[in-house]
């Protein structure tokens, strides 16, 4: 996957991803209109399909709501790369079908850098800077869940194959 980096700092909580006042919505498309509204008001209008959210440590901390990864999915972000994730956000993102990769080198990535990410190997190529970083690749079974679009779609596939 290839996309432009949207850079965020440490401790980006789920209220920053999608403010609580928008929890009345539950579809990815509707939530996408308000993604990062309080911290990056330009995000929803300027994010392009396959763009990549890049952050520091503890991305997705705070409330354990599925609305945050749903908003990212609705924004058509191809993946989220962070130094670390709040565990409940990490799991919710997988369940929703949003790829998440942990990479210690996110400080080297700047807002607007063009990235190419190989989810299967965890290799991140920064095309803007000519650098390569190594993220922790997702285990095969987790990648299968993400590839199917989330846990529900993955379960449907397993049932249909029986």
Curated annotation (Swiss-Prot):
Record InterPro entries: Aconitase/3IPM_dehydase_swvl, AconitaseA/IPMdHydase_ssu_swvl, IPMI_Swivel, LeuD, LeuD_type2/HacB/DmdB
CDD domains: IPMI_Swivel (cd01577)
Residues of the signal peptide: none
Keywords: Amino-acid biosynthesis, Branched-chain amino acid biosynthesis, Leucine biosynthesis, Lyase
Gene Ontology biological process: L-leucine biosynthetic process
EC number: 4.2.1.33
Gene Ontology MF terms in the entry: 3-isopropylmalate dehydratase activity
Protein origin, superkingdom: Archaea
Catalytic activity of the protein: (2R,3S)-3-isopropylmalate = (2S)-2-isopropylmalate
Cell inner membrane among keywords: no
Protein family according to the UniProt entry: Belongs to the LeuD family. LeuD type 2 subfamily.
Function per UniProt: Catalyzes the isomerization between 2-isopropylmalate and 3-isopropylmalate, via the formation of 2-isopropylmaleate.
Subunit structure: Heterodimer of LeuC and LeuD.
Protein name as catalogued: 3-isopropylmalate dehydratase small subunit
Organism: Methanosarcina mazei (strain ATCC BAA-159 / DSM 3647 / Goe1 / Go1 / JCM 11833 / OCM 88) (Methanosarcina frisia)
Lineage, opening ranks: Archaea, Methanobacteriati, Methanobacteriota, Stenosarchaea group, Methanomicrobia
Gene name, Swiss-Prot/TrEMBL: leuD
